[in-house]
Amino acid sequence: MRSTQKYYEADAYRTEAAGRILAAEPDGCGGGKIALDGTVFYPEGGGQPADRGTLTLPDGTVLHVTDVHEQGGVIWHATDALPEAAAPGTEVQEALDWAWRFDKMQQHTGEHILSGILHQMFGAENVGFHIGTDAVRMDTSVPISAEGLREAELAANRIVWQNVPVCITYPTREELAALTYRSKKEIEGQVRIVSIPGADVCACCGTHTAATGAVGQIKILAAENYKGGVRLSIVCGERALLAAQAMRQRQADIGALLSAKPSETAHAVHRVFDEYTALKFAHFGLCSRLFEALAAQTAPGEDAIRIVPGLDPDGLHRLAVKLSEATTGLCAALTANEKGTGYCLARADGDVRALTKALNAALNGRGGGKPGICQGSCAAAPEQVERFLKENHIL
């Protein structure tokens, strides 16, 4: 079977073409895959997802292209159906989902610009790249500071604003040997070079905008340390605008909650955090006084089962420990929670693991710990747990 002619390489803005079926195979699930002699559909590869769109048969039947892959120079189009009319030799009309394609062009060209700038500024190699549904993932070979990323983001957007042409060339082996360009792997055969003046020269098989202005904007959403470098999450074009709108709305929502202007939300959050910290320390102190009072009411040797509303796991643990300092009997701190009851069992110089296991089995609980103290929760009311412990405390 002869190779498929790649119309998208010569013109990334071409959205329609007539193609002839070279081969068609069913997929066993009601759909199939169709090889064409020429295509406007980009096959998945190089970090860029496959194009989507339709193939229309001579009888008007429309097949939806859901995936595209290249195998041995032949490009196969996965379709949602494969009627008998889709036979070798049949001519079909190809039509791209342009919104899908143009988004990938914006993301891919934006990634090239930012990768080239990061390489210029920090010597960073792009060691990983994928255009995802929500964002583009980029992995760099070296760590880059937050300030460095801000500077690179600004420099990349300046290239966008200059609206310089994105040039596609196919240099000879001699020309290629004299050319400095980025490439993540050795390439056999003809090398396709994508050049962006002032930003990048890179070997690439993907689709790109004709000029950088069409990228619109490049925005870094997140950065994290990853394998000695940085993993970036970026968006370009319409995605960047939508991300900015979403961030602005979140800021407005936070401002409304805190009665603060959008420009003052950070200060307002710090204020609320300081207030929360003060209340947390005050609550800790009040709980300590309560736990001491409950322990003081406990006679040496007696069991101490206390139900206290609103305790978190740390509070349960602190109360159980405080009670066990006052008595050698069974000590239990209980509180109602969303699962039923949170508990912490303790016994000075004793072992509460068997009792904990029995409690979990009887009341659909989960938890465990060390011989002297165990903690968990169960699907029962605190009063049910209290009754079980009183009836089984000798375990």
Language-model regions: role of each:
Residues 1-395:
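A glycine- and charged-residue-rich anion-binding loop/surface
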